[in-house]
Each structure stands twice: as C-alpha cells, then as structure tokens.
C-alpha cells in the first residue's frame, strides 16, 4: 500500500513531463491535413500579419523591378523575353505557395499548442491530490537542505535567469516559444519582452526574499546577501 502511494505520484510526474510531447505530436499529425484542406478550400480572405505583409511586399517589389527590366530590354530576342516572363510567373506562384505554407504552419502550431495547454490544465485539475503530494515531497527535500546550499541554489538560479548574460538566454527562449506558436519573427516584441521580463522576475524575487525568506529563515537571507556581495 505504501509503495502504491509512492508510485502513483511518481507516475503522475513522469506523465506531466512526457504528456505535452505526445499531445503535440499526435494532434499536429491529425490536424495537419484538416488545416491544409480548410485553408486551401474554405479560406476566402488573405490573412497577413505585419511581418508577412512586409516580406511579401518586398518580394513583389523585386518582381515588379524584373517586369520593368523586361520592358526596358527591348533589344533582347523574343525567346529571351519569353523566358524572363516565365521566370517571373513561376516566382510569383512560388511566392503564393510559400505564403500559404506559412499561414498553415502558423494556424497549425497555434491550435496544437492551445489544445495542449487545455488538456494539461484539465489533467492538472484532475490530479490535484498527486500535485499536493509532490509539493509536500519538494518542500520536505528543500527543508532538509542546509542554509548554505539553499543560498547557493537561489544565487545560481537568479544569476542564470536575471544575471548579466541572461538577456541572450531569454532572447533564445522567447524566440523559440514565439516560433513554436507559429508566429513570424518580430524583433520589436522580442526585444521588449527581453528587456522587461527579467526586470519583473528580479522584482518578484526581491519581494519574495523580503517577505517570505526573511520571516522563515533570517540566517538564509544573511548567507544569501553575503554570497551575493
């Protein structure tokens, strides 16, 4: 009976770790054909965000320049002009295909991640007892650590998350999440998140040290500040 009580929360922890990957892969495969069919047959309006519109505009400007060049080079033989016109036509078709693939990719990733979060949320609510037991195990483990190890762990985590070199890590993380949801790169949004998110975390950490740790373990706060200095 005791082994069963230990095994169930441990199995729940493993399922939480691997369940998102399984949900993501399974739903992505099942939704891919449906999203592709819907976009190619039912979509009547062109869906563009600012980044996609800018890229398409740049491509069409290039094609327009080629067309003007086609009109200017009148001394070329007719066969050469025909080849140039065919090349512009093929490039336009390829551009439209790339646009459709980008839109399908964005819708597919966004819908898959949304379904994944909803399922994980329901799974966490149903497994509330297991989460409470896992939380008690973590608290017991942290309680048995010495104040020096606790202070070192807090200092290590804070330096990794909000230290001097953390903006590069946050930029990579936010870009990966941004792309995982299917959105196009937006340097302004990514830069604003990189510049503000670590500051918010630093403020929350200082407030937590001041309110919680200073009340629960003043010696830990003293050791932390000594190591930080």
Curated annotation (Swiss-Prot):
It is a multi-pass membrane protein. PANTHER family: CHLOROPLAST ENVELOPE MEMBRANE PROTEIN, CHLOROPLAST ENVELOPE MEMBRANE PROTEIN-RELATED. Keywords: Antiport, Chloroplast, Hydrogen ion transport, Ion transport, Membrane, Plastid, Plastid inner membrane, Potassium, Potassium transport, Transmembrane, Transmembrane helix, Transport. HAMAP family: CemA_PxcA. It comes from the Eukaryota. The chain crosses the membrane at residues 7-27, 106-126, 154-174, 189-209. It is found in: Plastid, Chloroplast inner membrane. Contributes to K(+)/H(+) antiport activity by supporting proton efflux to control proton extrusion and homeostasis in chloroplasts in a light-dependent manner to modulate photosynthesis. Prevents excessive induction of non-photochemical quenching (NPQ) under continuous-light conditions. Indirectly promotes efficient inorganic carbon uptake into chloroplasts. This is Potassium/proton antiporter CemA. Pfam families: CemA. GO terms for biological process: potassium ion transport. Belongs to the CemA family. The gene is cemA. It catalyses: K(+)(in) + H(+)(out) = K(+)(out) + H(+)(in). InterPro entries: CemA (IPR004282). GO terms for molecular function: antiporter activity; proton transmembrane transporter activity. GO terms for cellular component: chloroplast inner membrane.
